[in-house]
Structure formats: structure tokens, C-alpha cells
């Protein structure tokens, strides 16, 4: 997601949206001054471990939204779960990269249709930079459309769209196609266009760029879509402090404290917090070395202390489904 604020605006929007005290949360009917949060899990469908973590975090924890990587091998199991657990807020984690060394996936469109999206093995590129170097905007649109169509063909209607590794925010042309596909299917796209306090601090964005980003948010709002006020996207880089035991109890305690601190830093308005809840098996280390932080996300979401904090502070949890319903009622 490091590309988010670097390229978000260059989509041909030239107007500047002056910042006001009214958040998108308020425009959607939430009380003024309240923190309204989506606790969102990325990477569903990537592996058995990812699916198990998602299922536990959504049914036993406080996480309340998820997005699915449609090119990945464990998608059928996740879609079955979503059909059985009706009402879960589930979107698409639009995927244009395959970042792991020995665990790869390929474009749904097929190499002949999107040759710029594949490496010499026929898999998607491992990095965002490689996608930018080799793929055209037409290929990107073709592939993300195929991912939406696969979901719909499986009887899975996504509540929202977002971007794996932020690839769709890497260039203005990619961003245009992301928004275009969302509008064509009337599916909300994840885009923070409000005060952006947290994401600006993370990315080091200046005031001029933030004003431009707010212009994109205004455009999406005018098109009938909900818009985020902010985005928290720093949990993936977390690790246990040096010297701490690496057992489940310690991981849970430390990462719960991390999320409580993160929620304290959230400003009033509508914020999405990104996480990667995973229940790592003995196989997961052969996929990725990120098991500790991913397991920590799961354990934190299931910690009664986190639920208690959210309730005590009066933080409102919402979903993309609710946001679109609220937006549809506003003229």
C-alpha cells in the first residue's frame, strides 16, 4: 500500500475539495464525533490457514469484514463458508501479484489475454513494481473484471472491492480502471478520501496531495458510493518486542495492546483497519514467514479485552454492506 497516496489523485480529477469538519461517517448518518470502524481481514482464500483464521475471527472475534483473493486455491472453501454464514460482509481483494517464493497463483484471465501480468513461470509477478513495468491498464481491467465475474459466477456478490498489496493504486491508469470496474458493477471501492490522519502520517503525504485525494473522495461520493475518512494499514509490520516469549498467550497480549493503541489513535469518522487473521499450521512457514503477525491479528480479534475496550469507548463497528445501504438512502 505504499503507493496509495503517491498516485491516488492522478486520475483526471482537477477540482479541489476543501476540507470541512463534516466527516463521511456523519454524512452517512453516524453520530458526530464518533469513531466508526471496519475491522477488515485481507487475504481470504489464499490458504487453508488464512481461511481458518478468517472464519474464527469473524465468528468468534470482533472482526467484521473480509476480502477474498479470487485467483487463489482456497477460494471455493471460503465461498462455501460465506454462503453458509449468511450476512458476512465480504468483498474482493483484487489480486495482481503473487508474492511468495514457492506458493504461486496465476491470472484468471489466462496468459494469452494478459501476458503482461505473468512472469516466466506463468504466475503473477511477485512485486507491484514488476506489474507497473510490464502490465497495461487494459490487462489490469481485464483481470480484475474476471475476478469479479468469477465471484458472481460462484454465487458470491461482493460488498466491496480493495487491492492486494495496493497494486491498483500504483499508477493513475490502474486506479482509473479500479474505480471504473467498481462503478460498472455498482460495488463500493475502498478509498479513503476524508481527513486521512493515519494514512497521511504513515505515508508522509503533504497537504496539497491530501486535498487532491479528498477530491477523488468527493467524486466517488457524488457517484453514490460511500467513502472512508481514513485507513489504518500498519499492523502487518508488527512483531513481538525483542526478548518476549513467542507463545500464543504472549502474542495475544502484545497484539491486543497494539490494536487498543491503534484504536486510541483513530480520529472521529469512518476508518478501516486492515489485518491478516491467520491460524498458521505447520505448513504455513513454507508459504510465508509472516505467521507471527498474522496469528497475532487473529488472537487479538478473539481477545475479550479488545471487545471490552471497543464497547467501553463507544466505538461503532460497521461494514461495507451497511455503508452502501446508508449511502443509498441519501439524496
Q: Where are the regions a protein language model picked out?
A:
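A short alpha/beta connector and helix-capping loop motif
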Residues: 48-72
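Catalytic domains of cell-wall/extracellular-matrix polysaccharide-remodeling enzymes
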Residues: 137-228, 233, 252-253, 264
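C-terminal domain-boundary segment and adjacent tail
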Residues: 189, 286-331
Amino acid at each position: 500500500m505504499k503507493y496509495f497516496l503517491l498516485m491516488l489523485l492522478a486520475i483526471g480529477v482537477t477540482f479541489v475539495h476543501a476540507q470541512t469538519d463534516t466527516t463521511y461517517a456523519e454524512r452517512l448518518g453516524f453520530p458526530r464525533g464518533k469513531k466508526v470502524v471496519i475491522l477488515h481481514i485481507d487475504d481470504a482464500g489464499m490458504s487453508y490457514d488464512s481461511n481458518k483464521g478468517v472464519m474464527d475471527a469473524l465468528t468468534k472475534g470482533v472482526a467484521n469484514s473480509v476480502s477474498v483473493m479470487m485467483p487463489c486455491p482456497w477460494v471455493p472453501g471460503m465461498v462455501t463458508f460465506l454462503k453458509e454464514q449468511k450476512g458476512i460482509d465480504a468483498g474482493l481483494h483484487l489480486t495482481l501479484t503473487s508474492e511468495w517464493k514457492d506458493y504461486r497463483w496465476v491470472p484468471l484471465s489466462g496468459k494469452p489475454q494478459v501476458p503482461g501480468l505473468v512472469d516466466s513461470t506463468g504466475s503473477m509477478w511477485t512485486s507491484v513494481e514488476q506489474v507497473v513495468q510490464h502490465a497495461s491498464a487494459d490487462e489490469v481491467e481485464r483481470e480484475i473484471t474476471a475476478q469479479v465475474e468469477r465471484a458472481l459466477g460462484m454465487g458470491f456478490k461482493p460488498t466491496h472491492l480493495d487491492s492486494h498489496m495496493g497494486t491498483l493504486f500504483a499508477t493513475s491508469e490502474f486506479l482509473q480502471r479500479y474505480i471504473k470496474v467498481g462503478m460498472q458493477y455498482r460495488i463500493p471501492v475502498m478509498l479513503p478520501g476524508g481527513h486521512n490522519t493515519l494514512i497521511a502520517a504513515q505515508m508522509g503525504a503533504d497537504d496539497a496531495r491530501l486535498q487532491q485525494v479528498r477530491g477523488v473522495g468527493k467524486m466517488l461520493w457524488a457517484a453514490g458510493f460511500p467513502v472512508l475518512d481514513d485507513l489504518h494499514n500498519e499492523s502487518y509490520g508488527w512483531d513481538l518486542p525483542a526478548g518476549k516469549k513467542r507463545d500464543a498467550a504472549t502474542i495475544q497480549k502484545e497484539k491486543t495492546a497494539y490494536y487498543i493503541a491503534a484504536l486510541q489513535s483513530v480520529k472521529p469518522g469512518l476508518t478501516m483497519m486492515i489485518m491478516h487473521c491467520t491460524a498458521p499450521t505447520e505448513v504455513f512457514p513454507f508459504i510465508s514467514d509472516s505467521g507471527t503477525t498474522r496469528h497475532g491479528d487473529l488472537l487479538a480479534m478473539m481477545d475479550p479485552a479488545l471487545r471490552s475496550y471497543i464497547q467501553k469507548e463507544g466505538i461503532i463497528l460497521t461494514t461495507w454492506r451497511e455503508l452502501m445501504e446508508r449511502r443509498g438512502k441519501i439524496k
